[in-house]
C-alpha cells in the first residue's frame, strides 16, 4: 500500500516539475543588470535558426507593448539585451556601472532590429590577465564579469 502512495507521489511531483515553464538564464541576467526592473517588461524567446546555425543572431521587436528579444542562443539573447539597452533605451552599461534601473516607460523599437555575427569565437582578454587581480575575486565580482562578457557576446573568455 505504501509503495503505491510513494509511486503516485513521485509521478505527481515529476509531472508538476515538467509542466513548469523553463526560465532562460538571460532572465536572471536581465534582472541583475536592470536592478530588478525588467521582469515582465522585456521578454526573451529562444528560436534556433534552422537554415544556418553557424551564425549567432538576435532580433529585437515589440510584442503587446513589451520588448521582445529573440535569439538562437543564450549568448545571443544577452547580446540582444545589451543592444536594446544601449541603442534603443539609451542606457549604457559600463565596466564601472554594470547595472541601471529601467525607466518607467520603455521605448519600443520602431521596427525589427536584427544583428548577426559570422565570428564563431569571440575572445576576451589574454590568458595571463586572469592571474592578476582576478585570482582574488569573489563570486559576486566574477558574476559581474561573466554578465559583462555575455552582454558583449564573448564566448571565449
Residue ranges and their predicted role:
Residues 1-23:
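Bacterial Sec-dependent N-terminal signal peptides
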Residues 14, 29-32:
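Generic structural signal for isolated residues within well-ordered alpha-helices
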Residues 25, 29, 49-51, 63-157:
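Feature activates predominantly on carbohydrate-active enzymes
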Residues 31-53:
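Auxiliary, metal-adjacent structural segments of Zn-dependent hydrolase domains
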Residues 42-44, 60, 67-69:
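Hydrophobic beta-strand residues in large extracellular and virion-surface proteins
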Residues 54-59:
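Exposed beta-strand-loop-beta-strand "reactive/processing" segments of non-cytosolic proteins
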Amino acid at each position: 500500500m505504501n509503495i503505491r502512495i510513494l509511486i503516485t507521489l513521485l509521478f505527481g511531483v515529476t509531472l508538476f516539475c515538467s509542466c513548469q515553464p523553463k526560465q532562460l538564464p538571460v532572465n536572471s541576467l536581465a534582472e541583475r543588470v536592470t536592478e530588478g526592473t525588467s521582469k515582465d517588461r522585456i521578454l526573451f524567446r529562444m528560436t534556433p535558426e534552422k537554415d544556418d546555425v553557424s551564425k549567432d543572431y538576435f532580433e529585437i521587436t515589440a510584442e503587446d507593448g513589451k520588448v521582445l528579444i529573440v535569439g538562437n542562443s543564450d549568448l545571443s539573447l544577452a547580446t540582444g539585451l545589451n543592444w536594446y539597452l544601449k541603442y534603443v533605451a539609451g542606457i549604457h552599461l559600463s565596466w564601472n556601472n554594470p547595472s541601471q534601473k529601467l525607466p518607467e516607460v520603455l521605448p519600443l523599437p520602431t521596427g525589427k532590429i536584427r544583428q548577426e555575427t559570422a565570428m564563431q569565437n569571440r575572445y576576451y582578454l589574454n590568458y595571463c590577465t586572469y592571474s592578476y587581480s582576478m585570482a582574488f575575486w569573489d563570486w559576486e565580482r566574477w558574476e559581474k564579469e561573466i554578465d559583462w562578457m555575455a552582454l558583449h557576446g564573448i564566448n571565449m573568455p
